[in-house]
């Protein structure tokens, strides 16, 4: 797509705050009015997928897709066409410093919680996997509880559930993944009784085979790339096998769901929560009250906001994946400027900006350089 000729540089921008109450379709309707004001460029607040209901968009949960609350790709393309037809340009707000991780809706963060240091996205976040507190070795602290862990556990405010072919821990709006290797705790409970009753029926043998496969999965502390790839491949196969088995065998489904009930304990019987406690101790995260965040948290945040985790933009793979959408728009000639949010929070702001300039400047000079502005003014030292 060839951009409509306009001024060589954004001379007058008008910021449009995008949210579910002001979408791409709404923005499209404002373009003629903005042109009449002499505006050269529409400047959009973040348009990547943000936390549901976000009214600002800076809590991005997936940087590589458009925010569905703002509209679909066709509606965005119509907005772009309208901007071009009126001889105007487009400037985007970019958020490289942090991501929204609240309610485990961020797929990168969710992957880290499920797979720990062996997660494909473990290097995306600034997590101290070896903090002074030994209980947090190879774990990330999750200060999401409204009270002390023991009180929440025994009040049954969090519960084990089986949903979408996986075991998860549900705590109000949080749906926390459980390491597939730890599923052996759930599936092996009362197994001898099932074997006796099932008389080695094929469904029981399949469950035993699934248990063997789970036990052989590489652990969450695995660092060998080949073993990590094996972990990702095999865990998905095992998930599918268990889901199929539960769909086809009422006996196995009843067995598993009864174990889920048992693991959730009985209020008033402290010892009945030992099974769930042991299961949670096997995870790559440690649940805690929000009150301990300032003292024990081991991941870098945006200021002191627990729901905004800092990103390691100095990692090349993280940089490329998180800027996928922006780089695509630049190549297509859709965007000619960007405003970088909180650049001073990055590990190396200058290096980041130089790298962004390199990747957005065509070597053949076919396009004008991307206009890059930053939110913060950095001191000369």
Positions of predicted regions on the chain:
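Catalytic domains of carbohydrate-active enzymes, especially glycoside hydrolases
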Residues: 27-51, 75, 325-337
């Amino acid at each position: 797509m060839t951009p409509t000729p306009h001024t060589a540089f954004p001379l007058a921008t008008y910021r449009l705050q995008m949210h579910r109450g002001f979408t791409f379709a709404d923005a499209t309707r404002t373009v003629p009015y903005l042109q009449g004001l002499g505006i050269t460029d529409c400047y959009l607040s973040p348009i990547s997928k943000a936390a549901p209901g976000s009214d600002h968009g800076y809590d991005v949960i997936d940087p590589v897709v458009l925010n569905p609350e703002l509209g679909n790709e066709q509606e965005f393309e119509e907005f772009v066409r309208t901007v071009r037809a009126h001889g105007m340009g487009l400037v985007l707000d970019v958020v490289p410093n942090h991501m929204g991780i609240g309610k485990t809706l961020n797929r990168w963060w969710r992957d880290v919680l499920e797979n720990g240091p062996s997660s494909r996205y473990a290097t995306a976040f600034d997590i101290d996997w070896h903090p002074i507190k030994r209980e947090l070795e190879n774990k990330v602290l999750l200060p999401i509880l409204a009270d002390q862990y023991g009180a929440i556990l025994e009040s049954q405010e969090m519960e084990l559930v089986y949903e979408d072919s996986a075991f998860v821990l549900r705590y109000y709006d949080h749906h926390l993944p459980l390491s597939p290797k730890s599923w052996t705790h759930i599936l092996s409970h009362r197994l001898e009784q099932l074997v006796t009753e099932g008389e080695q029926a094929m469904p029981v043998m399949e469950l035993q085979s699934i248990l063997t496969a789970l036990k052989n999965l590489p652990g969450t502390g695995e660092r060998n790339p080949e073993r990590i790839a094996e972990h990702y491949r095999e865990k998905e196969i095992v998930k599918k096998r268990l889901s199929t088995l539960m769909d086809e065998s009422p006996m196995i489904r009843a067995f598993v769901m009864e174990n889920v009930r048992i693991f959730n304990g009985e209020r008033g019987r402290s010892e009945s929560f030992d099974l769930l406690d042991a299961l949670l101790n096997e995870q790559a995260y440690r649940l805690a009250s929000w009150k301990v965040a300032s003292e024990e948290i081991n991941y870098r945040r945006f200021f002191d906001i627990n729901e905004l985790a800092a990103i390691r933009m100095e990692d090349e793979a993280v940089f490329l994946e998180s800027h996928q959408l922006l780089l695509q728009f630049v190549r297509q000639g859709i965007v000619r400027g960007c405003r970088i949010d909180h650049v001073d929070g990055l590990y190396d702001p200058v290096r980041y900006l130089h790298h962004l300039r390199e990747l957005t400047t065509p070597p053949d000079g076919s396009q004008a350089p991307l206009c890059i502005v930053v939110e913060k003014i950095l001191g000369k030292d």
